[in-house]
C-alpha cells in the first residue's frame, strides 16, 4: 500500500488490506459477496473478474493464479513476487502481479512498473520480484482461458 495508492484486486485478504484506505477487491469472495456468489456458482471464465475490476476501478491485481484461474486474457502479467523460505501463512511461495485494463482499453504498465521497481528495491533479503518480459505483452498469460 506504500507504493500503489489505488484500488487493487487480490484473492487472499491480508496485509494488503491492513490500514489501506484504497479499495481492496477480494476475488476469492471472503470480502466481496458478489465474487463469492460467482465462485459458488461453479466454473466460470475470467470475464467476471474483469467486470468486478472495472466496477471498482482496479488496475493492479496481486493473486495466486493457481487458486483462481482462469485469469482474464486481457490482464497483462507484469511480474511475480517470490517469497523466501517455506510458505507458512500463504498457500504458495509466489504472488503474480497483473496490469488490469480499464473498460474497453488496454492495460497500462509504465507507471505500474516504475512503482513496482521501487517496491522491489524495498524487499527483505531472500524475497525477489521478477519482472515479466513486457515485450511479450501479446503473448497470452499462462492462466488465460477464452
Question: What are the residue ranges of the model-derived segments?
Answer:
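C-terminal luminal/periplasmic domains and tails of membrane-associated envelope-modifying transferases
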Residues: 1-6, 10-11, 15-23, 27, ...
Amino acid at each position: 500500500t506504500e507504493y500503489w495508492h489505488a484500488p487493487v484486486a487480490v484473492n487472499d485478504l491480508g496485509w494488503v488490506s491492513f490500514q489501506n484506505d484504497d479499495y481492496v477487491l477480494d476475488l476469492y469472495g471472503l470480502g466481496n459477496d458478489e465474487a463469492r456468489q460467482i465462485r459458488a456458482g461453479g466454473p466460470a471464465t475470467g470475464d467476471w473478474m474483469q467486470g468486478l475490476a472495472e466496477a471498482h476501478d482496479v488496475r493492479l491485481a496481486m493473486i495466486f493464479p493457481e487458486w483462481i484461474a482462469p485469469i482474464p486474457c486481457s490482464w497483462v502479467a507484469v511480474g511475480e513476487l517470490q517469497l523466501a523460505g517455506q510458505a507458512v501463512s500463504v498457500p504458495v511461495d509466489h504472488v503474480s502481479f497483473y496490469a488490469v485494463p480499464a473498460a474497453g482499453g488496454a492495460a497500462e504498465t509504465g507507471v505500474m512498473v516504475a512503482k513496482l521497481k521501487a517496491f522491489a528495491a524495498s524487499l527483505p533479503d531472500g524475497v525477489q520480484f521478477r519482472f515479466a518480459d513486457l515485450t511479450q505483452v501479446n503473448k497470452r498469460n499462462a492462466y488465460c482461458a477464452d
